[in-house]
Amino acid sequence: MCIRDSCQCGRSRKHSIEELRKKIYDIIWEEQLQRGVAAEISQALMEEVYTTPKPGLVDREDTGAHTDMDCQTFQKSTEAIAEDLAAMFEAGYSWEADPETLFPLLRERGKKTEEKMFAATGGVNTHQGIIFTIGILAAAAGISLRNYGKIESESVCRISLEMTKKELEQDLRKLKQSSGITHGEKIYCHLGEKGVRGLAMTGYPILCELTVPHMKQYIANNRDKNQINVQILLEIIAELTDTNVISRTSEKEMRWLQTEAKAILKAGGAFSENGLQKVRELNQICIRKNMSPGGAADLLAATIFLCRMETLMERRKGILQ
């Protein structure tokens, strides 16, 4: 608790019982923190997968537009990467320098995490986008907890911007001089859509301004958890320029999917039987078109993660009071 010898402190009764109690809880909390974060990440990733129905995506009813993965594939992948993503939170929590100096280290760790994912899934890309997005958000959450003693989506998104903006802007400048390697990079070179890089370097406004506030409101209104997740997914699809959809189909088809999501929301969304039936009908169309809004699914998982982290902090506050 202080730099003095513990025996001297004990004899002098320098620290109150309440101070000692709080310090003990802090030590226990820090020891359990990474395990707790890993559990929250696992829950967020699998909660997204099990959300049903979803258009073109793997869920409990079918595998959407995918023939190489199912719920079990995602379970294996989640088990392989959750601890690594939690370690990125720990890296942020222990980082003392500027956030932007942490990002190159996160990217290197992310490559190793991708290798674990591919090893677990037999080469299937289940969570590449998640590793990038949750890795950044987890590290930013760690920095937020260290610097401000709390985790709130607004501060996490702001720190994400501070952490990534400079390096990702450099990435995009270099990409302009090439034809791109990944699907997302090729789309940026041809269409100028920045994809996951653009979301990170602008501080994930869709999360902190739209999906997290909406999810918290739906939870406060005691809505069904699965329906909340379907609703949030529809809201994301309606707003996001999803490069996953573009890479599998075209920009025109992605705009069509946005329009369909908006129409379902207008018809009552996931909180109506009619809306859920329309999602199932849209799923069948997406399967025929080989269309999968994977970028939107990643942001649903990110939304769940941020809400769960805020709840985790509330539980911590309750323990310390």
What are these regions (language model features)?
Residues T121-A138, N290-F305:
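Conserved phosphate/anionic-ligand binding catalytic regions in large, soluble enzymes, centered on
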Residues T101-L102, L106-T121, N125:
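Active-site cofactor/substrate anionic-group-binding motifs, chiefly glycine-
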